[in-house]
Every structure is written in C-alpha cells, then in structure tokens.
Amino acid sequence: MSDGILSFSSKNDKRGETSGKELITPSSQPVDDSSEVVSLRPDRFESYVGQTDTVETLKIAIQAAKMRGDCLDHVLLHGPPGLGKTTISHIIANEMGGTLTVTSGPALEKGGDLIGMLTNLARGDILFIDEIHRLPKTVEEFLYPAMEDFAVDFVFDKGLHARSHRYRLKQFVLVGATTRVGLISSPLRDRFGIFRSLDFYTDEELVTIIRRSAGLLNVVLDDGAALELARRSRGTPRIANRLLKRVRDFSMVRSSGEVTQKSVAAALSLEGIDSKGLTVLDRNYLRTIIEFYRGGPVGIEAVAATLQEETDTLVDVVEPYLLKIGMVMRTSAGRRASVGAYEHLGIKHQMELF
C-alpha cells in the first residue's frame, strides 16, 4: 500500500488483515486514529449517539442492500471536523462485513495511487477518502468510471498508437468525507447515492458520549462535571473526548482523581477554553474583527493575515462553531461580529458609544 493508507478489517480473509479493526499499515497515520481514540469509537449504529436522521438513513440503506444481496450506494458525508465522519465509515464497514481502507485526498497524488487501492478491493469492501475535496483533478477523473461502472480505463502509448483498456473492479463502496462540500466538483458529487450533512451535537448527546468514554477510560465523574464538559466541547465529540482526557489528568494530579464540575472548570481554564467552549484562537479571531476592523464587515483573508493564521484554519475550524452559536455573521461584504460576541468578550458595542 502507498503512504497515507490504512487498512482495517471486520472479517477474516486471506489478504493479511485480521478480524476487528486492527491497524495494518501505520504510515501517515491520521491524528485521530491513535489506539486510545479508536477504542472510544462505537463500532455499531446501536451504540452511536446523535446524527439521528443520518444514522436512520444509513441503517435503512444498509439493511436494504443486504436484503438484495447488493453493495451499498456510495456515501458522501459533509460537516465540520470531529463530528463522526470517520467513525461512521468504520461502522458502515462493520455493518456490511467488509474491509475498510482509509486514505485522504492529499495522500492520493497520482492516478496510480488510487488505481492500486481500487484493484486490491474485494467485493463489498469500503474505501474511505477523507478530505475528498482535496483530490487532484487527474486522480478524481479515475473515480468517475470506478464509482459508476466499477471499472478503470488505462491508456497505453500516445497519439496514433494510443490504446485504451478497461479493467473491471470488484463492487465496492466509496465513503467520502469533506468539510468543504462546495469545493467538490458536480460530476463527483452527483455520483454519490447517499449525501448527508452532520450537524453539531447537543449538550445532552455530548453528556451521553462523555459518560460512555469515561466508562471506557475508567474515569469517575459526576453529573455536573459531565454537563460542564459538554458545554465546553463546541458540540463536537472529538473535542469532548480530548478534553475528558485533559480533565482526567488534571484531576489525578491536582485532586482526588474524581472529576467534578470544579476540576473541569480549572483544567479547561489552563487549556484556555472558556465557559462557551471558545479557545484562545476563537477569542483572538473575534477581537480582531471587533478591535482592528470595528466589528466588520471584513474579508476572511484580512482577518487571517492579521492573526497570521491560514485562511483554511479559520474557515474550517474556527468559524463553523462561531456561526452556529451566533458570535459571527457572514455577509456579502465579509465577516461581522454579533452583539453576542461583544458581550461575551466584555467589550462595549460601538453603537452604545454614541
């Protein structure tokens, strides 16, 4: 396998994979695929919390495919980072009984990288491409016949001597994940039979996830601690699990080991996370709009330049949650800070000065 590719298996076969979700090729391992994080992932839809409509849609589609003895339609998942797109791909593989191969758009630099993976897939296997919007155009074009006809076309020689050969693939399921669905070309997007957008989780859903993760990590926490942690997790399970570990460490060193609401507040204060889950970068983003650009409107490139941050970081990581809770507004003229942003930062709104 080429760099950037991981293989997992949910069945026994003769290709070297083992049962369960054991890591086979660790090269270029994604940051959220450490052994502890993987252990916190639910492996069936029955234990998956949140995204009710998406889960129901996939359960129906999977059951129908099994009844027909057919493969599942290709799936495209859209949403901010950390909402469960990779986890859902693992669950789809488990539910369908296929082997999961994980890669990402930037890792597939040449058409040969993709073709090598496609030709190694068995019937019913799942290929998960994270950040699919970052696929090079030349690689993306190989996906069109692969998704539609389960075939890839090879061209030999050039000019008058050019010859084309079609290689038949086994039927597979492509699961694509993206944070920027608008950057996916229409020909690729239209080839997905199932398209679902994932939304931020409610505090109640996050409390359930935190309690499950705490049990797996042998962490004792009370109701107030679970709710406080949920409120500061930006509606994102990945962040909730990460903060739970930081709070666990803090409680082990600075208190009796039991996680309380007070220890959550103290631990996350050290992390620079406030009562609404805003990080230092979030607050600097809002302060930049308010103090440097008088509340906006201002273009995202100008904000990124002032903060010395990548524009994609602000668009993909910072803005989704701030938009969700109404701290910032996107207008045709640019970004504008809301009254709520002024109040949260303790800054007097400009309109009140006159």
Swiss-Prot record:
Enzyme class (EC, first level): hydrolase
One GO biological process term: DNA repair
Region (Large ATPase domain (RuvB-L)) location: 2-201
Region of interest (Small ATPAse domain (RuvB-S)), ranges: 202-272
The keyword Cytoplasm is assigned to this record: yes
Family: Belongs to the RuvB family.
Subunit structure comment from the entry: Homohexamer. Forms an RuvA(8)-RuvB(12)-Holliday junction (HJ) complex. HJ DNA is sandwiched between 2 RuvA tetramers; dsDNA enters through RuvA and exits via RuvB. An RuvB hexamer assembles on each DNA strand where it exits the tetramer. Each RuvB hexamer is contacted by two RuvA subunits (via domain III) on 2 adjacent RuvB subunits; this complex drives branch migration. In the full resolvosome a probable DNA-RuvA(4)-RuvB(12)-RuvC(2) complex forms which resolves the HJ.
Protein name: Holliday junction branch migration complex subunit RuvB
Organism of derivation: Desulforapulum autotrophicum (strain ATCC 43914 / DSM 3382 / VKM B-1955 / HRM2)
Gene, per the UniProt record: ruvB
